């Protein structure tokens, strides 16, 4: 084989891979659009009247996750299953955002942390790497950390809306998250940096709870939490 033939063959490989990446990008753009729609829907809970609409907003968000499933089903057909991590960078950020959105919906519904397995069901993915197109553990953890930041914001807006029990629930939940993450030996630099932000979320929520206590809402808040 001549030198020119070698390079012609290599160009064929490069062109084929570029075609794959372009197909992936198209699907990822659709995923990003759907994620924005879900986020816009859920952001309404931060507004005064939004607290009364939480069940309705969560139900509507779950309908949008049906579209997410369709896009992810399409995405996994665009590349060989064994090359998941070769192209993972293309959808990593939007997938972390979708994990956060799924976790936010579940928290608003039940005030619990969604499991990785439950997220895979919501998104229509596999929980195990051996099965191909799966939810990477680090992507799940990143999404959970985004949730913590969102909940710290929600604790502040809850007080503005007159919901004084919610910040205490959020405080308990975020402190449990912090304890859980302390059990992990995080190697991923990006994940570790994001985890560093969790302590600020914890502090922010604690300040909200403390402010409620100073203002005399502590007994009322505690009683409301016990009732729930």
UniProtKB/Swiss-Prot annotation:
Modified residues (Phosphoserine): 190
Superkingdom assignment: Eukaryota
Enzyme class: hydrolase
Chief place where the protein resides: cytoplasm
Any GO molecular function: RNA binding
One Gene Ontology cellular component annotation held by this UniProt entry: nucleus
EC number: 3.1.-.-
Statement: the UniProt record of this protein carries the keyword Nucleus: yes
Modified residues (N6-acetyllysine): 187, 199
Region (Leucine-zipper): 177-198
Region (DNA/RNA binding): 86-90
Compartments in which it is found: Cytoplasm; Nucleus
UniProt keywords, alphabetically: Acetylation, Cytoplasm, DNA-binding, Endonuclease, Hydrolase, Nuclease, Nucleus, Phosphoprotein, RNA-binding
One example of a Gene Ontology biological process annotation: RNA metabolic process
Family in the record: Belongs to the translin family.
Name assigned to this protein: Translin
Species classification: Eukaryota, Metazoa, Chordata, Craniata, Vertebrata
């Amino acid at each position: 084989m001549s030198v020119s033939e070698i390079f012609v063959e290599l160009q064929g490989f490069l062109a084929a891979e570029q075609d794959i990446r372009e197909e992936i990008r198209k699907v990822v753009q659709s995923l990003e659009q759907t994620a924005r729609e879900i986020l816009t829907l859920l952001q309404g809970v931060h507004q005064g009247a939004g607290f009364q609409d939480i069940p309705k907003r969560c139900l509507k968000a779950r309908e949008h996750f049906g579209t997410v499933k369709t896009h992810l089903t399409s995405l996994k057909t665009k590349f060989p299953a064994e090359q998941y991590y070769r192209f993972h960078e293309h959808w990593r950020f939007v997938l972390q955002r979708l994990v956060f959105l799924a976790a936010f919906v579940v928290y608003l519904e039940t005030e619990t942390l969604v499991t990785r397995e439950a997220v895979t069901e919501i998104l229509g993915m596999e929980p195990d790497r051996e099965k191909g197109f799966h939810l990477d553990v680090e992507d799940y953890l990143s999404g959970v950390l985004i949730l913590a930041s969102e909940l710290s914001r929600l604790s502040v807006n809850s007080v503005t809306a007159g919901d004084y029990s919610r910040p205490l629930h959020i405080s308990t939940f975020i402190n449990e998250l912090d304890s859980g993450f302390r059990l992990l030996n995080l190697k991923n630099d990006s994940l570790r940096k994001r985890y560093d932000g969790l302590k600020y979320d914890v502090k922010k929520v604690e300040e909200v709870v403390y402010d409620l206590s100073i203002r005399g809402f502590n007994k009322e808040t505690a009683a409301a939490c016990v009732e729930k």
